[in-house]
Amino acid sequence: MLRKVRSWTEIWRWATLLFLFYHLGYVCGQIRYPVPEESQEGTFVGNVAQDFLLDTDSLSARRLQVAGEVNQRHFRVDLDSGALLIKNPIDREALCGLSASCIVPLEFVTEGPLEMYRAEVEIVDVNDHAPRFPRQQLDLEIGEAAPPGQRFPLEKAQDADVGSNSISSYRLSSNEHFALDVKKRSDGSLVPELLLEKPLDREKQSDYRLVLTAVDGGNPPRSGTAELRVSVLDVNDNAPAFQQSSYRISVLESAPAGMVLIQLNASDPDLGPSGNVTFYFSGHTPDRVRNLFSLHPTTGKLTLLGPLDFESENYYEFDVRARDGGSPAMEQHCSLRVDLLDVNDNAPYITVTSELGTLPESAEPGTVVALISVQDPDSGSNGDVSLRIPDHLPFALKSAFRNQFSLVTAGPLDREAKSSYDIMVTASDAGNPPLSTHRTIFLNISDVNDNPPSFFQRSHEVFVPENNRPGDLLCSLAASDPDSGLNALISYSLLEPRNRDVSASSFISLNPQTGAVHATRSFDYEQTQTLQFEVQARDRGNPPLSSTVTVRLFVLDLNDNAPAVLRPRARPGSLCPQALPPSVGAGHLITKVTAVDLDSGYNAWVSYQLLEAPDPSLFAVSRYAGEVRTAVPIPADLPPQKLVIVVKDSGSPPLSTSVTLLVSLEEDTHPVVPDLRESSAPREGESRLTLYLAVSLVAICFVSFGSFVALLSKCLRGAACGVTCFPAGTCACLTRSRRREGLPPSNGILRIQLGSDDPIKFVDVGGHSHGCTPLASAPTRSDSFMMVKSPSAPMAGEPVRPSCPPSDLLYGLEQAPPNTDWRFSQAQRPGTSGSQNGDDTGTWPNNQFDTEMLQAMILASASEAADGSSTLGGGAGTMGLSARYGPQFTLQHVPDYRQNVYIPGSNATLTNAAGKRDGKAPAGGNGNKKKSGKKEKK
């Protein structure tokens, strides 16, 4: 019954103890689980999932586990229930030694997100060890003269258990001379001493055999015994005496071996051998003390034998005995404590619990990269550890617990600037001098598609000569992307503009992998001069990014078009007859060859040359004007002359064409050139012809007067102006004005605005474009005269005698008048207004695209001249162009192609400045009146 009560009492004590331990952890702010030592595998320690408020369903996914290799050998976590279980039995004595408390810190780590939890497990001691004496037989010698009350220290027993399970008492077998006294040291250990209660009498009893028992406080208690043999010695009545009963010294843990720590002194008043004192360690001094310290037997010097380690043991306490040489020998003992002073001899060590090897560059600031713990076994300030990383890195350290840190991102990451980081973590203690440890964490930055492809230029200009071969490489549009992987793979595509009629894909092809632009067909400058398109570079990221570049392609002109003769024009292989009055002098204008070239620039700059003639000395051809004149006076009996005029451009190689003129005196031209005007009656006589001419002259005067009055009235209604008739037979209203704005157009009237210095500033041809039929050759008879037409439609029955067949004037070549899109920018205008003479020299613009515009304007001017429109009265330097080209464009730098426009039957050319330079008035377009041998019919 008594045993049953005791068992219930023990159970209650254990339950109370476990309850106090469990709740003590919560009071201290830390979860602590008590568990008895030597618990079997699978023993329940605590439910960490419940205590850490974790979802048990996600424990497997988050991989809840115990951190640290040492702790993983003893504990494990059940991922199904979240329970902390014993993995291997724990021996408290092997784990914590003789420490009063055995606390094992545990760290738990979860993933997704990465988190750490801390708890403690207290290993509760179990009374599984019995006290044991160093030896089973203890020998003690006591002089018979020892007085009662003298104490003799005994070797104490050792118990591996701690706390209440350690040694709690000593017992001595019953006897009449000795008693047992137990002293408690500062560390809580008990030291037995033998107390002499009665004087000894060696003669009665020389030795005593006693039993010494050590009992622990476990339940049930365990005990250990040793035999104590006491020998009674002969009288030595003075024992050695120490100066003090206990000594305490301090020494640095870094003290070198061989250092003398203390010298003990003991005196014995006896003489002889009884006064010789010998020092030695007491019998119960542990071996670890004997291995560290050496005690000289005669001098009492305590010498250090090996290195000290404050972190392993911070003090040593043992007994030293002094014995004399008497018989029996007498001895005395003292207590010696050696305290170790901590020295900063241990550098901190860093443990990276968990780290991410790769981090995307889009990670937000505050993302956990690694969990770091630091430890320093030193004490005090030597164990205070601080952690740091380089300042220039976009990372920071956050303190979670004591000596626990989290490495997080502190700013944005850019893989293109830095693709990996070697983060050196430095742990330093606060010792003097401080010690530090380095640990490098390697982190790779994964790419995110945050950079669009970029071209080296925002726009490209490509120049390609016409007549190129299909498939030729035009340009290579390379784009770069600082991203990596698929984010840096670039594909190219052609963007078609919506507002353009010409599709760029019909001219070029784009390689989607390399960005190379190839021509799909041959370019023709006369059809396409420029081509603009956009190319898009797009990466393969998610989402994809892109950029565009504008490409301007300019087609360069090649000399692939031969000059075309506009006037005089004959069918291929035929002659173009030209009439020459008899007995003309030198310098007489026979005709003017007008040619154009569809090319541009120097390729369109034509020159004229007399290639073939029966007598080249009779004729001269102006090199650039194309005027065919007589070089010497022509005799009256000159036979017909066949002149071959070659027209050649300035290209490389130059191209040319030719026109053949048949120049003959007027009597020889009538059989060659048929008269288009049919006569309904035979010629009668000179008197009748004179009558017809007189009637015609009167009619023409009336018509001219009426036209003049009508023109004058219109000019007076529109603005104050003066009427001026030009040599070509065209009248215009001239207005002097200092204002720069032009006059509004009016139908059927040529308006010319003059500046204060008389040059023409504004020309406007109103009304419809009427064709002027070329007049017949100059009449040779005295009663013939030249008829001048008004700008209106030709009158019925009007006599016309063209020098070339009218149907062949343009030979199927129709030149449309220039539209309003042909405008010159300020940078393309050759110069200020001024007159241009009809010399053979001239400067061509250097810019090919300026000359392209000028080429079109020249064609338009030549077309107007060929049609005989009123624009022939243009001002100097304007080449007879209409006002739509602006008064500021005078073509000073272009050869005067007005000289290439020739009006048959007239010596006038398209210039009004020659008269000013020569000091003469321009010649009339109707020439001299001469009689003809033929009748003219209205």
UniProtKB/Swiss-Prot annotation:
Residues covered by the Cadherin domain: 30-133, 134-242, 243-350, 351-455, 456-565, 572-676
GO biological process, one term: cell adhesion
Disease in which the protein is involved: Neurodevelopmental disorder with poor growth and skeletal anomalies: An autosomal recessive disorder characterized by global developmental delay and impaired intellectual development apparent from infancy. Affected individuals present with progressive microcephaly, hypotonia, delayed walking, poor or absent speech, intellectual disability, and variable skeletal anomalies. Variable features include seizures, non-specific dysmorphic facial features, oculomotor apraxia, and non-specific brain imaging abnormalities.
Region (Disordered) location: 791-847, 908-938
Bilayer-spanning residue ranges: 693-713
Species in which this protein is naturally found: Homo sapiens (Human)
Gene Ontology CC, one term: plasma membrane
Superkingdom, taxonomy of origin: Eukaryota
Chain positions carrying an annotated carbohydrate: 265, 276, 444
Name the UniProt record assigns to this protein: Protocadherin gamma-C4
Biased composition range(s): Basic residues: 928-938
UniProt cross-references to InterPro entries, sorted A to Z: Cadherin-like_dom (IPR002126), Cadherin-like_sf (IPR015919), Cadherin_CBD (IPR031904), Cadherin_CS (IPR020894), Cadherin_N (IPR013164), Protocadherin/Cadherin-CA (IPR050174)
PROSITE patterns: CADHERIN_1, CADHERIN_2
